[in-house]
């Protein structure tokens, strides 16, 4: 092996065979890949599809389709697509029913005020938040695999949808609208929000058909947390006009956060003292209650419903004091009874809305899947990402027919459900029962609810998202790169908007992956005396090296982005180019350890083939060790065996090194052994 003598160079290859062998060692011949296949056999080759369908193939295909349509086949499909058919027979009624009922009612009680609050964030009337807290929850309970997941309105999605609604159906510049004109404007906005839900649901169903559940891995944890934290700041700023009683047009597009702040500061003198007082008192109650629920979650039988208490107090105060007429406090007003008629959303704006539906569908899937995975790991069960795509796709698609806006799982209500003792998706049905009761019998009560209270509920629900910034010091300690991704994504979300911030975060995150693979260092290996282990020589000065033998390990995928780096590193170590490793002896035998190369693309395979030819031209005997089956198959298709013989492909570095040492011996019998 080429390298400095300080690393324990062995002057004579004969000395290597005289090293102290490991205790209880046995000896065998070095195994090439071909010899290993001959002794132990290989995997069964997958049958290739014929170029033209033959009669036996058509018969097999017909039998397969007939089996899928048979009774057992249909039952298997139902079991796969309707999770309740799997978990209901195993449901522990005595142990779980009470917990599911209490948790479902608790979450449902919170859904009512939060749904109305997030509806205002979506720029639609409050009652549509109640619809979005009912239909999607019901559908997910039937199709979802997350036993502890709570779905419904989500502040980040409401903010993103509200921006689309404001762009597609802007507020008229005149400002003063008649009652009929206001109803028409609200109807158009409801239709736009439902169209966004329809588009995002259709996209998720398309991803389900294509089995693209793996896409959730492209939204890394730093990107998701930075996105939600930055969106929480957008929510806070967007609610300032409602907190202060200001009637300001909603800002959309890039720099909307700063535009809103500037508009609020310029109109600060026009604030309503009554609504400022209501907002201050609401926050004084809501924020401490949230903190108490977190700090004493182990001592409380069920979390304190601060939102419900605040809604009751504010509504009674506004009704008894006539705040809406005496001080012009904005209230929710009348809510329509029952449910809306199923109606296909207007698709005229769908081409414009579809581009906005894509990031919404990605955020929906990524947040829901990550939350479901966290609790699945905690409670030892598994979720199915592709089934989650189906559940959220159907949930958004069908609920859009009932004028619902986009929905997903939420961190606040999911943690609330778990803390309250929820065990299965059955808790969602109890939550739906509470929302249904509010829609059927409690509508008149919400007439006098101040909108400022709903704004305070929006802000207080962002508490956990703001506190995600506390994890930054730990993230910096673990990985500087992930810390940089978090900061860049957060700045992009805050400065631009949520959609562009998400795109920036994904691009930066993917670029860091590419950059990490391009900065990989090739490791030169040496033998640990008395063992069969080959370790990087930079880890110890006592590792043995043999003159003329170079063992290299490249611990990264070999593809188009790393091809140049691989080429330069191998040239430098083997002395094939103009830049030669200083103090290195000429290499006679080289071993490439492929155990760290997980995959090779066409460009990488051609680079390996070119390397073997250059080694032949320079008189270097090249051996490849420990290629996985996929890498070896790709190299074979690139005509690697035209440049090397099967006798140069070994199953391990130890086997290749034993063969190389025999080749370096000037005389002696050509018999070599490997310690095992």
UniProtKB/Swiss-Prot annotation:
Spans through the membrane: 101-121, 124-144, 149-165, 190-210, 226-246, 267-287, 300-320, 353-373, 398-418, 426-446, 487-507
Record's signal peptide: none
Keyword Ribonucleoprotein: no
Gene Ontology cellular component annotations, sorted alphabetically: membrane
GO molecular function, one term: antiporter activity
Residues annotated as domain STAS: 539-660
Topology term for the membrane: Multi-pass membrane protein
Disordered, as annotated region: 1-24
InterPro entries: SLC26A/SulP_dom, SLC26A/SulP_fam, STAS_dom, STAS_dom_sf
Subcellular location: Membrane
Domain of life: Eukaryota
PROSITE patterns hit by this protein: STAS
Keywords: Antiport, Chloride, Membrane, Transmembrane, Transmembrane helix, Transport
NCBIfam families according to UniProt: sulP
Annotated family: Belongs to the SLC26A/SulP transporter (TC 2.A.53) family.
Function according to Swiss-Prot or TrEMBL: Chloride/bicarbonate exchanger.
Protein name as annotated: Solute carrier family 26 member 10
